[in-house]
Amino acid sequence: MRFRDRVVLVTGGASGLGEATARRFAAEGGKLVIADINTEGAERVASSLPDALAVTMDTGDATSVERGIAEAVARYGRLDVIFNNAGIDGQQQALHEMDLANWEKVRRINGDGVFYVLRYGIDAMLRSGGGAIVNTSSTAGLTAQDNISPYTFTKAGIVGLTRSAAVEYAARGVRVNAVAPTVVMTPLVEHFIANAPDPEQMRRQMESFNPKPGIPTADDVAGVVLFLASDDAAWVTGHTIPIDGGYVAR
């Protein structure tokens, strides 16, 4: 029970990777704060956990983030762990044809949003005596891919921000790391495969994307997140861990 009585905030916690990771934290004794722009989804997840609070949070809105973290601290009195996970993919477009609204939306949520959670989350952690943060980057933040420049821009920025925050707060008891998953098998990806013109071909294509055959599950990623957030990783800070079956190593 590595997280017994620790207060854990998960952004984007209403579905997918956020939900799977929240359930893992709860199974190891954590008190969960499920933050999501989808209020109904957050309440659904929170109500299924032993000790959890649902908060409505638009991570791209600083006021919403500040309010949500204040709700968490008001309920539990402290904040020990943050899984800074909320994000979007955006539209696939060539850079010279990029719709500016698409660029701004991805930057606001994936870039500004991660900063806002760090800004207000670290402030709460310092008042609690320290803590651990895990940001969600992507293999797209470590390598170049076509037609997803806003996503790559923001996910690479998370890598740099993770390092900066880790160095800035190491002496004050706050560790900051990141995970960089490849494509993960979530309900959204399952839906994408099922609705492809040739679902079996799409599945085979995705399963051969990385050197290690197959597609990691949300639970595969959650295991790494929990390690980084736990005392097992007490001397690990400032790092981004690819969860990619060797994709970045090629």
Language-model features: locations:
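The beta1-alpha1 cofactor-binding region of Rossmann-like NAD(H)/NADP(H)-dependent oxidoreductases
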Residues: 39-40, 57-68, 100, 219-220
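Residue(s) in the substrate-gating loop at a strand-loop-helix junction
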Residues: 138
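Substrate-binding pocket helix/loop in short-chain dehydrogenase/reductase
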Residues: 93-95, 99-105, 206
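Alpha-helical segment proximal to the catalytic Tyr-Lys
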Residues: 123, 167-171, 234
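Active-site helix of classical SDR
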Residues: 118, 154-157, 162
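C-terminal substrate-recognition "lid" of short-chain dehydrogenase/reductases
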Residues: 2, 115-118, 214-243, 248
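Canonical Rossmann dinucleotide-binding motif of NAD(H)/NADP(H)-dependent dehydrogenases/reductases
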Residues: 2-33
